[in-house]
Each structure stands twice: as C-alpha cells, then as structure tokens.
A protein has these predicted regions:
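Loop-helix junctions at membrane interfaces
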Residues: 14-26, 30-33, 38-253
C-alpha cells in the first residue's frame, strides 16, 4: 500500500492521499464535493461529476486500460500464427498481430496504440523468449509503430472511413520506408554482429529467393519493401472490415 499523507485542499481542511501525484486531483474533488454539499441539493450528483472530470483528465480510464491489455494479449497470441512469403528470406514471416494493434489505436488513440504494441512484444517475450537476441522484437516494435501511429494520428483528426483509408495507406508507406532503412542500416548489421556471421551470408539468403539481390540495398528494396507492403495491405484490409463492428462493441461496454 502507498504511504498515506495529508494534502491541504483549497478550502481550510486536509484530505488523505495514497500518494502525492494525485494530491491536487483529490483536493479538487474534495472542494467540489464540499461546495455541492453546501448547496443542499444535487450534492451527490455534482460530486460524481467532479470525480469523473478529474479521472478523465488523467487520460487513461479503467475501461481504456482494460482494452489496452486485451488488445495487447490478442496481438501477442497472433504473433504465434506466422507464415513465410515466397519473395522474402525465411526469417521474415508474416503475422496478423498488427490487426488488434491498429484497431485499438483507432478506437483508443495513438498513445494507446503504442502501449498495445509494447504489451504485445513483452507478452510474447515472456511466453516464447527470443531467438534473435532481442533484435527481432525491437524491429517488430519500431516498424509496427511506424505503421500504426501515422494511421491512428490521421484517423484521429477526423474519424471517417476516408480518413481511415488515408491513414492506413500512409502507415503502410511509412512502415515500408522505415523497414528498408532499419534493415539496411540497423537490423541486418545487428544480426550479423549478434550471430557472428558476415553480411554476405544474410544477403545470400535474399539472393536465394531473388537473383537480383546482390547487396544490402537491393536486399532492402527487393525483399524487405515488398514484405512490408504486403503486410500493410493485408492488415489494413482486415482492419477495414472489422473495425466498425469492434468499435461498436467497445462503445457499448
């Protein structure tokens, strides 16, 4: 339990707090409740409204936190359902874990989308561990955010189907560019260092599926870019058809 302290409200009195960061909020509620009680009518209702206003100002309600956890858990499960694509090396596998992340980001906001993405990675790490020295998980987090956050920010500016489509197209393009950059300059060198293999070996895996791949740049353009484009399109289509039904369910809870 947190240490109980006393915080002075704006009126002459003290209110008990569990911990200091919420002192001003509880003091505000205390003062508003006293004022409501002094009127003699509607005091309880005004006190409830005061609590709701101050809770909403914190940004994360209990309902929102519950949905963030739920979407993160579903996304982590979907990470186990993965399959390779014929034009990418075997260590690139497509999964649908970004679907609940994107739906959650549309419904709850881009910040919530980031936390759903983070929970997805952490839960998956706890359950399965890492086979890539954490590099694959970091890549999933960064590139996933590159897809979800632009889409959610655009949709948040005007919640229409048109905005959703524009957001998902933008997110797909940003993810594709970010994926190429990250793989060419960060992830592939990190893989090579972590597993003690030359870059030529990794590039050779790309050459095995596409003869035009002969260096890191062509690997990124001919293997990574198509992979992320396909992933963005598939996730966007599924989200487009599911979102309305799931958002209605969220609002009804």
């Amino acid at each position: 339990m947190g240490k109980t302290v006393l915080a002075r409200s704006r009126k002459e009195g003290y209110v008990p707090l569990l911990y200091p960061p919420y002192g001003s909020i509880l003091a505000d509620v205390h003062d508003q409740a006293l004022s409501a009680a002094e009127t003699g009518r509607g005091g309880i209702k005004k006190m409830e409204n005061a609590i709701k206003r101050n809770m909403s100002s914190e940004g994360f309600t209990a309902k929102k936190l519950a949905f963030i956890g739920l979407f993160g858990a579903v996304a982590s499960v979907l990470m186990f359902l993965e399959f390779p694509l014929p034009f990418a090396p075997g260590f690139y596998k497509l999964d649908l874990s970004e679907v609940p992340v994107l739906i959650g980001a549309f419904a709850l906001g881009p910040v919530s989308g980031f936390f759903i993405e983070l929970i997805k990675i952490l839960v998956h790490l706890v359950i399965k561990g890492t086979q890539t020295a954490g590099i694959g998980e970091l890549a999933n987090l960064v590139i996933g955010c590159a897809f979800v956050l632009p889409a959610a920010l655009i949709y948040r500016a005007g919640k229409t189907r048109k905005r959703a489509v524009i957001g998902m197209i933008t997110g797909t393009l940003v993810m594709t560019v970010a994926g190429c950059f990250m793989n060419a300059f960060v992830l592939l060198p990190a893989y090579a260092t972590a597993f003690g293999m030359p870059m030529e070996t990794l590039v050779g895996m790309g050459t095995a599926v596409n003869k035009a791949v002969h260096d890191v740049l062509t690997f990124a353009v001919l293997c990574v870019a198509p992979f992320n484009l396909v992933k963005g399109i598939v996730v966007s289509l599924i989200t487009f058809f599911l979102y309305k039904h799931i958002s209605t369910l969220i609002k009804s809870v």
